[in-house]
A protein has these predicted regions:
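Phosphate-interaction motifs
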Residues: 1-157
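Helix-rich terminal scaffold detector
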Residues: 160-170
Length: 170
């Protein structure tokens, strides 16, 4: 019988898992943007047509990995958001940067929108890749690079694998 050993998950490539490995938490951990653009409430884009555009005031910026935006967005406001940025409260859709124009006046910055957007457009939902306690890898599975990436993203530190066996030829 081959015994088991605990190793760092990043060193698990081409090793055999000796136990089932589960996700420690939801991933992504919050609803976030799948594109660079502007977080808005989709209702603010209703009524837009080829002849009727809409202007939304930019009230902030969110980068991936930053803390959630503190303000609740009001009607006709937008927040610049990078891919992976957490959706601010009061928003439910992301307008890709290439689908709008930037406008500046002496005091404020705005985006000009020329089309409607649906609720949850360009949004990745909390847990859409992995839910907490999802099975990542079954016992006795050969660990590959995709598994290593999942372990890293989900904070899996150590894993149990089968010990390497030594074979000696004479």
């Amino acid at each position: 019988k081959i015994s088991n050993q605990s190793i760092k998950s990043i060193n698990g490539l081409n090793r055999i898992s000796s136990e089932n490995i589960y996700s420690n938490y939801d991933y992504p951990s919050a609803d976030n943007s799948s594109v660079d653009g502007f977080a808005v409430n989709a209702k603010d884009t209703h009524g837009i047509s080829k002849k009727k555009f809409k202007r939304l005031k930019i009230v902030g910026s969110i980068s991936a990995g930053s803390k959630p935006f503190k303000k609740f967005l009001k009607k006709d406001q937008a927040v610049e958001i990078m891919t992976g940025g957490i959706l601010p409260r009061g928003t439910n859709s992301i307008i890709p940067i290439e689908k709008c124009s930037l406008i500046k006046d002496k005091i404020n910055n705005y985006i000009l929108i020329k089309q409607k957007f649906k609720k949850f457009e360009n949004v990745r939902f909390k847990g859409s890749d992995f839910k907490k306690k999802d099975l990542l890898i079954k016992k006795n599975t050969l660990i590959n690079s995709n598994h290593i990436m999942a372990f890293k993203a989900l904070g899996v530190g150590n894993i149990k694998v089968k010990k390497k066996i030594n074979i000696i030829f004479f």
